[in-house]
């Protein structure tokens, strides 16, 4: 397949859709922003795409909890269609608020029919965390999005990023990325782990490796110039986040 199309899902309160669209276009995909109401009216539109993105933001104002309203809409009205999309080889990524929604639908860690198993809740600091973080990628993960990546340096911006679940569930997660300190050491204290999330987990995937979600924002660092200290630190032209999107597009193109 030469042409790849990515659906950028929008809801009231989504505010990272433009950056996510730009990241996928930079990676070689065509994109289309589709409002949730349009998708609810015509779920068959999913068949037009190879990748589906749940961007960051504050969907529905997070009034009932981060990602909760969107999760209910997806689970109750789009669940079967999304399952078919995934079964046909489609890729799904959730970023920040998108991660929260995917967790609350049960899509992650999955399967959706088993319901919600984990949650993302208030940061230990009790405040909104907006900072740059160092991440290590699990070399044993099956995640399509992170193949060939060892380390990442990405920003976070969230108030509810603390991953919680029973020890049994947490230990079985397909954990993909972890918070570390600057030297790559895990189990580092705040602010290296900005939310206080269990086992330093910053992102997970389903068993197939084709559904991936993370709290940091890769779409906010696809060019070196997006970093506030780009000239001073002599950062390369390509930001760390871009590889996540190019991996997805490359994989979708081969299907």
From Swiss-Prot:
One of its GO terms (molecular function) is phosphoribosylformylglycinamidine synthase activity. Its EC number is 6.3.5.3, 3.5.1.2. It holds the Pfam family GATase_5. Keywords: ATP-binding, Cytoplasm, Glutamine amidotransferase, Hydrolase, Ligase, Nucleotide-binding, Purine biosynthesis. It is found in: Cytoplasm. It comes from the Bacteria. The keyword Ligase applies. One of its GO terms (cellular component) is cytoplasm. The active site is at residues 96, 217, 219. Residues 6-255 form the Glutamine amidotransferase type-1 domain. It catalyses: N(2)-formyl-N(1)-(5-phospho-beta-D-ribosyl)glycinamide + L-glutamine + ATP + H2O = 2-formamido-N(1)-(5-O-phospho-beta-D-ribosyl)acetamidine + L-glutamate + ADP + phosphate + H(+); L-glutamine + H2O = L-glutamate + NH4(+). Coiled coil: none annotated. CDD domains: GATase1_FGAR_AT. The keyword Flavoprotein does not apply. Pathway: Purine metabolism; IMP biosynthesis via de novo pathway; 5-amino-1-(5-phospho-D-ribosyl)imidazole from N(2)-formyl-N(1)-(5-phospho-D-ribosyl)glycinamide: step 1/2. GO terms for biological process: 'de novo' IMP biosynthetic process. Its main location: cytoplasm. SMART domains: GATase_5 (SM01211). Part of the FGAM synthase complex composed of 1 PurL, 1 PurQ and 2 PurS subunits. Part of the phosphoribosylformylglycinamidine synthase complex involved in the purines biosynthetic pathway. Catalyzes the ATP-dependent conversion of formylglycinamide ribonucleotide (FGAR) and glutamine to yield formylglycinamidine ribonucleotide (FGAM) and glutamate. The FGAM synthase complex is composed of three subunits. PurQ produces an ammonia molecule by converting glutamine to glutamate. PurL transfers the ammonia molecule to FGAR to form FGAM in an ATP-dependent manner. PANTHER family: PHOSPHORIBOSYLFORMYLGLYCINAMIDINE SYNTHASE (PTHR10099:SF1). This is Phosphoribosylformylglycinamidine synthase subunit PurQ. It comes from Dehalococcoides mccartyi (strain ATCC BAA-2266 / KCTC 15142 / 195) (Dehalococcoides ethenogenes (strain 195)). The gene is purQ.
